[in-house]
Amino acid sequence: MGGVGQCQWPVWQVDDLTPCFQHDYLRILLPAVVIGLSVLNLGFRSARHAASRSKSPSTHAYAPVSNGDNSRPGAHRTDISPDDDAIAQDDEDDDEGLAIGGGRLALVKTATKGSIVQADTPPAQTLSVVVEELAIAGLVAVYVIALLSPKAHGSYTLTGTIIGLTTWVYVLVLATLRLFLGNTQWRVPHLWNHTAAIYSCQWLFLIGIFRSAMVHPSSKLAQILVIVEFALTSLLFFMAITTRKGNKTVLLEWEDGIPPARENLASLFSSFTFSWVDQIVWQGYKEPFEMGKVWNLLPKDKAATVLSHYRRVKKTTKLYWHLLRYFKGDLLSQAGWAVMSGMFTFAPTMLLKAILEYVEEPESAPRSVVWLYVILLPVTDIIRSLGDNRALWIGRKICINVRAILVGEIYAKALRRKAATGKDTVLGSEKKEDKPKGGFISKIKKMLCLGDNDESEDGKDGDKDKEDSSDEQANHGTIINLMSVDSFNVSEVTSYLHFLFASAPTQLLVSVVLLYQVLGMSAIPGFVVMVLLLPVNIGFGRAFNSTQKKIMACSDKRIHSTNEVLQNIRIIKYFAWEHRFSESVDEKRKAELKALRARYMVWACAVAVWNTVPLLITFFSFLMYTTVEKRPLHPSIAFTSISLFMLLRHPLDQLGDMLAHVQEAKVSIDRIEEFLSEEETDKFIQLGEDNVNEEGTRIIALKDAAFIWGGKDIIAADGSQAFRLLDIDTEFMIGKLNVIAGPTGSGKTSLLMALLGEMTLLKGRVYLPGGRSREDVRPDPETGLAETCAYVAQQAWLVNANIKDNILFSARFDEKRYRDVIVACALERDLEILDNGDETLVGEKGITLSGGQKQRISLARAVYSNSKHLLLDDCLSAVDSHTAQWIFNNCIRGPLMKDRTCIMVTHNIPLCVPHSDFVVVMDNGRITHQGRALEVITSGALGEEIAQKAKSETPNISRIPSRVPSSVGEGSGNTLLDTDGDDHLSKPKNAKKAKKAEAMEETKATGAVKWPVMKLYLASMGSWWFWVVAGCIFISQQASDVVSNLWIKQWASQYTTEVSSVPISTSSHMYGTQSFAPTYMVPVQTYVKDQLARNGNATALDIVVNSEVNAQYYLVVLAIIGLAGSLTAFLRDLWIFFGSLTASAKIHTRLLNTVTRAKFRFFDVTPLGQMMNRFSKDMEAVDQEVAPIAIGILSCALGITVTVVLIASITPGFLIAAVFITIAYVLLAKFYLASSRDLKRLESVQRSPLFQQFGETLSGVTTIRAYGDERRFVRDNLTRINGQLRPMIYLWATNRWLAFRTDLLGDFVSFFAGVFVILSIGVIDAGWAGISLSYAIGFAENILWLVRLYSINEQNMNAVERIKEYLEVEQEAAPICEKNRPPQNWPAQGSVEFINYTTSYRKELDPVLRNVTFKISPQEKVGIVGRTGAGKSSLALAIFRALEADGGKILIDGIDIGLIGLRDLREAITIVPQEPTLFTGTIRSNLDPFHLFTDEQIYKSLQRVQLIGPDETIPTADASPVLPASPTTPGGASNKNIFLNLSSKVSESGSNLSQGQRQLLCLARALLKEPRVLVMDEATASIDYATDSKIQDTIREMKDTTIITIAHRLQTIADYDKVLVLDKGEVVEYAHPWELMRKGEGGSFKSMCDMSGDTELLAKAAKKAFDAKKLIDVDDEAADAAP
C-alpha cells in the first residue's frame, strides 16, 4: 500500500472494514472532500451575493397588486421568495408571454393580498443552538486529546486526527457565524445547509469506525474517544434533522382566512417521514374536514406563481417540451431519488441471500456479521422507502403545478378565443398533414408499431370533406372535458415519469448484472426475451394511444350532448322530449363504452403478456442452464434466479404501464395544444390602446369598414359566406344617446360586436376605448367615469352569485349610487318580492329569475359601473311597456347617464328614437340610413307611421309620465334622490331567510362510504352468479401462484439428497416500491402482479448433488402452470372489466334518466357545473378507475387468506406477531381513511366551481371582454384552481404519510423474520420455514396494499356516492299513467279552465298563484298581463305542470291534467318560452329533431314566422336551394338567407343567429306541431315591430288553436278575445280588452294602457276586435236560430 487512498479491494474482510479503508477514506479523504466542497460553495455564493447587492434589486416573478374590495387594512404583500429558484435565469425571456392581449390577461397583476405573520420560534430553539455549540466544542476537544495522547493512535492516526480537528474547527466557525450574524445585514446565506450536510456526512463516516471500535478495539482510550465522538456526532446529526430547516425566520401567509401551509416549518426528518402531516391526519380523525380547515398551498405552488414562472420559460414548438423544460430541475431531482430507491431495492434480497448462506454454513463467518445483515434488512429498506416517497412527493408537486398550468392556460385561451359562430372541431382527430409519408422508413416504423397505423374509421370519406375551416372551434363540452379530463390525464402522468426514465431503467440494469453473476451465459436468453418484449410494449402503447383517442373523442361528444341537454332542459321538458334526447345521449354513450371495451381488451391482453414474460425468461434461462450447459440447477441458483426474475418483472411492468399511460397523456396533451393553437380574437389589435383618430380626437366610430363572422375565408357548404357587415362608415356621438334600429336579422347586434372588436375585420378601422384592461384605466376625478365600456347583451348574462354581486361586478360599493341604480332599473319591487332581497342567489345564467329581471340586472350592472360608454343590445325587449317607459326615462335618459355615451340597439322605435341624438338604421348587413333622429324619422326609414307622428308633434314632446308608475316604484318613493336606505335593498329580510341564499352550495357526505353506495355499484356489475364466477377465477389465479412456488421447491430438491432450504422472499424488495397512484394513472395489474411475486420462492444450498433429474419434465410442467396463471390473470381482468362496463352503462343510464326527469326546481338551484361534474369526472372515475382497484383489493384479500392458511399450518407461532402487526395496520388505516376520504370528497366538490366558472365564462366571454374585466376572471380562476389543488395535495401528503409508516411496519416484519431464521437454525425444516417466512413477509405487504387500495377504493366510490346523490333527487310525476290516458286526439277543442288553483315553488314558500279561477273557451286568444311577480310565468308553468297544484285543478277539454301522465300532457300542448332554445346542428334538426315533418311543412312554418320572405322562392323537396353566387369583393356582396337551406348550420345555443332569429325559429318549431293549445311567453320580444305585426297576423289566422300569450307589448294582445290581469298571484280582471279599457281610471289594464303612451292605438285595435267579435257572435246566433 502506497500513499493515501491506495487500499486494496475488497475493503470488507470477514466481519469488518479494513483498517486502511477506515484510515484513508473514512478519516482523511472523504471528510476532506466534504470540507473542500463546502468552502468552494461558500466562496462562490458569497461572491455572487455581494455582486447582487451592488445591483438594483430585481422584481419578483409576480408582483402582487390590490384585489379590489378584498384588501384589508394592514395586509402585506405575498411576495415570499422561495428558498430555491424554480427557474434557471437562462430560461427566462424578459416578460414575454406575461402580458396577453395588451396586458388584459397579465399574470403579473393577478396575485392577491395576504397577511404575513412570523412563525413561532420553537421553545427549544435557543437551547438547541447552545447544545450545538457545546457538542462541536466537545468534538474539537476529542481530537485535541487524540492528538496529544499516543494511546489513541490506533483509531486516530496523525493525519486523520489533523483532518478531523480541522473539520470541527471549521464547523465551529460556521455555527458561530450562524448564531451571531443570522439576523443582520451581514448574514452569510445557506450556512445551515453546510453545517447540516457536514454533520450528516461525518455521522455516516463514523458508523463503520464506531462498529469496528466496538468489535475490534485497538485500545481502551481509543474506544472511549470513538464512543464519545460517535455520540456527539449523532447528537449533532439528529439535532440537524429534527430542528426547523434554515437559519432564518419562516414567514406564514394568511390569505382570506385560510390556514397557511406548514410544510416549510418541517425539519428534515419531518419532511422525509411526512411527520408534518400528523396534524392533518389527527384533525381529520377527530372531525370531518371542511375547506376552511385545509391548509393553503405554499406560495411557490400557487397557480399565479407557477403560471408566471412557466410563461417566462422560452417557448418551444411543442407543449410537452415546454413543460419538460420548465420542470427539468424537479424531474432531475425526482430521478436522483428514484435511482437511489432503485439501487436499494435489491439490498434486502442480497442480504437475505447472505443470511441464508450463513444458515447453510454457520461456521463460515462470526455471529456478529449475520446480526449486522439482519439489522441492515430494515435499514436498507427504510432508505429505499425514503427515496421512493421523496420521488413520489416531488412528482405530486409537479402534478399540481402541471394541472395549474394547463387549466390556467385553457381558461386564458377561453378568454382570448374568437366569438364562436363556426362549426365544432374534433380535438385530437388526425389531420391529413399528420399522416406519415410512404416509403421504407414508414414501413419500418409500422412494423415496429411506431408509425401512425390507426386509420380513421371514416377515412374513406376524407376526400369528400373540404379543408378544415379556420373558424372551427372546440365546443363548450369539449373545453370542459379538456379542463376536467385531459388536464388530469397529463398531470397524473407527470407524477410518475421517474418510473419511466429513472426507476425502471435502474432496476433493469442492476437486475441484469446480478442475473449474469448468478447464471452466467444462461441469462442471455432472458435478456433476449426482454429485448423482444420492447416492440410488443410499444405496440401496446400505440394500441392504448389509438383507443384513448377514440375514448376522448366519444367522451367529448357525449359530454357536449349532455351539456346541451342540461342547458336546454326546460324546452326539452316542455316538449316532453326527455326520452328522445336521452336516447340521443345514450347512442353517444354506447360509442364511448365500445371504445372503453376496446381499451380494456388491449389492457387485458397486455396483462396476460406481462404475466407471461417472466415465465418465458425463467423457462429459456433454465432450459439453457440445464439442457444446453448441462449444469445442475441447485436450489441456491434456482431460487436466487427466480427472485431476480421477479425483481426484473417489476420494472418491466412499470415500463409497460408507463408507456401506455404516456401514450394516453400524449393524446390529451395534443388535444390541449390543438385547442391552445386555435385562432384568437383580434379585438385587442382592432381597438388598440386608445380610440383617438388622426386628428387626436377621441371618437367612437367604424370607418370604411367591413366585417365577417369567423375567419376571412369562411365558406359554407352551399358556397355562401358567413354573415357580413359591408360598407360600414359611421361615427357615434360621444356623451349622447345613439340608437341602432332595423328589422330582425339586419345586423344590429353584429354592429355592436364589430364595435367591440368581436367580428373579423376585413378592412377599415374601429375606434372604441376597449383595448385596455379596466384595472389599468383611471377614472376622471371630476366625473368619476373611466374611458371604458360596459355592455348589456341581448341575452342577459349573469354569474352564479347573488343579485348584489352581479350588479356591483367587483366595483366598489357606493350605497347611494347602488340605490339610485336599483330604482332607475325598476328593481325595487323585485327585491321586495324575492325572499332574500338582493342577497338572493340567481343561479347559473340567472335561472331563478324571469327574463325581464335578468335583463334589468344586466342593465343595472352596466349603469352602476364607472364606464363612460355603454353598449345596450335590445335591453328593453324583455320588460313590459310601462317598465320600459320607466327605465328609458329614469335610467337611459336619467341623471345616472349624464356625460355618458349610450349606443343602444332597440325595436322599441316609438319610445326610443324620438328622444335619441343619433340614429343608425341597418338592413341586411349595411347601414341604410344614419343621422339625427328627426332626419332619419322624417326620411321614412323607420316606417311611415312614426314619420307621420313625428311631423305632427314637436320633438321635445314626450308621453312618458313624470311620476313613477305604481307597478315599478310602489312604496319606495318617486325620486332617484331618495336616500332612506331601506335595508331590504342590500340585506335579506331576516336572518332565517338569509340561510336560503346558500342553497346552491354543493354538499358532501361525511364518514365512511356507506354500504348502499357499494351495493349500488356491485349490484350494477352483475347478479350473484357474476360474483361466483369472479371468485372462482380469482381463486384459480392465486392457486396457480402457490402451485408454481411448490413445484420449483420440488424440482430444486431433486438435485440434493439432503437440503437445508430457506427461501429468498421475492417480496422482501417490494415494500412500497410500487407506491400507489390513482388507478387511472398506474394500473392495478402492477400491484396484483406484485402480489404474485411476493408469495415467496425458496432457495436451497445443496449438500449432495443428484445429477439424475429430468429437467425437461419439470420445465414443461412449470411452463404449463405459468401459462395457466397468465390465462387466469387475463380472464380475471376481462371478467371484472366486463362487469365494470355493465355497471358504467347502467349507472349512466339511470343518472341521465333521473336528472332529465327531475323537477324544474332542481335545475333552478343546481348549477350546471355541479351536474356536469357528475357526468364528466365522476362518470369517468366509474368508467375507468373503480374496476382496476377492485381487482387489486380482491387479489390482496386472497393473498392474505392464503398467507394465513400457510403460516397457520407451518409456523403457528408467527400468528402472534401477525396479530400485533395487523392491529398496527388497522390503526394506521383508521387514521388515514378518516382524513383521506374527506380530502378526496373536498377535492371532488371543489371541481364544481371550476366547471361552473368555465361554463359561465364560455357563455359570457363577450361581456367579460367588453368590460375589460378578463384579469379579475383570471384571478378568480386561479383562486378556484388553488381551491381544488389544496385538498388534492394534502390528500397525497396523507398518502405518503401512510406509505412510509406501512413500509416501516413491513421492515419490522423483515427484521423479525431474519431474527427468527437465525434463532431457528436446526430447530425446524429450513425449506418449510423459508416458505412460511416468505409468505409472512408477503402477509405484511398484502395488508399494506389492502389498506392502500381500500382507501383508494373509498376515494373512487366517492364518485359513485356523488352520482347516487343525484339518483335520489325528487322526480316529476310519471310520464304516462296507463289508467288515466287521455283520448288520442286530445285536446280536440282546446278549452282551458282553472278552478280555485293554488300553487307554490316549494311547500315552505308563499303561494305564487292563489285561488285562480277562470275559463278559456276553445279557440280563444287570451293575453296575460301584470307587473313583475304577479304570477304570469307561474301560470304558464302550471299549465305544463312544472308547478304542481297545492289546491284546485286545471282542466283541458274537461280532463284534469293533474291525473294524466306528463308526456301525454306536454306532447299535446306547446309553449314558446321567452328565452329561445336552440341546439347544435342544422335548421332542420332544430325545427324537427326527430324527423316527424316533411321539408314542405318546415318551409311553410319558416314562411309563417317571416324567416323566409314572401318574395323568396322556397326550394322543392327534390332540388337543392338555388342561391345566387356571392361576389368575391365585399363591396358588391350581400348576405344570403340561410333559412332557405335547411342544412344550414346552427352553432351551440344558436350563437350564429341573432336573438330575434332564434325566437322566430323557436316559434316556427311550435307552429309545426299545429297545437290545439299554444302558450307564448313573450315569444316575440326581440323581434322588430313590423315583423311582430306580421307574425301576429299569422297567429290570428290559427283559428283552431287556443292561444295564451304572456305579453309585455300591449299592442300584441289589444285585439285578443280576452285579457287576464294578474296581481300577487290573483286574478284582478278578466274580460275583453275593450271592456277593460272602458272601466275608467280604476281599471288595472286601463292604467297599463295609459302608461304605455299608446292608449289611442290600443283602444282603436281593441274596439275594432270587439266589434268584429260581436258581429261574429250575432252571425252565429242567427245561424243557430235558422231552421
From Swiss-Prot:
Residues 81-93 have a biased composition (Acidic residues). It is found in: Membrane. It is a multi-pass membrane protein. ATP binds at residues 742-749, 1426-1433. ABC transporter; part of the gene cluster that mediates the biosynthesis of pyriculol and pyriculariol, two heptaketides that induce lesion formation upon application on rice leaves but are dispensable for pathogenicity. With the MFS transporter MFS1, is most likely responsible for pyriculol and pyriculariol secretion and thereby may contribute to intrinsic resistance. Belongs to the ABC transporter superfamily. This is ABC transporter 7.
